[in-house]
Amino acid sequence: MTNKEIAIDFLKRVSRGDVRPAYEEHVHPEFIHHNVYFKGDRESLLVGMEENAEEFPDKSYEALRALEDKDLVTVHGKVQLAADSIWAVIHIFRFEDGKIIELWEASQEKIEDSPNEHGLF
């Protein structure tokens, strides 16, 4: 798999609740992340993702576009937590030895009355 394929596979699997197996296969043991809601270590984000999967068991994820440049991959995706909760999410992955070693993310909830006719997607 390319790094881009790994990033998308990881996002799809954790979104459907397959968190630990996705981590075991794709995440480097020395992984760090920049999600401000959790400690920056591997286990803290893993547990947070498991809790999110339990809270939103019907969550869906769609990768809309992805870019790969050397050891970096960026994925723009659409997450639907519930019928009235749709989010645009951008993940930036850094890879080392074929594994995800670092992760950044930014998200924005879709609003219905946006003045921008182009929207988030």
Give the location of each predicted region.
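C-terminal and inter-domain tail/linker signature
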Residues: 1-121
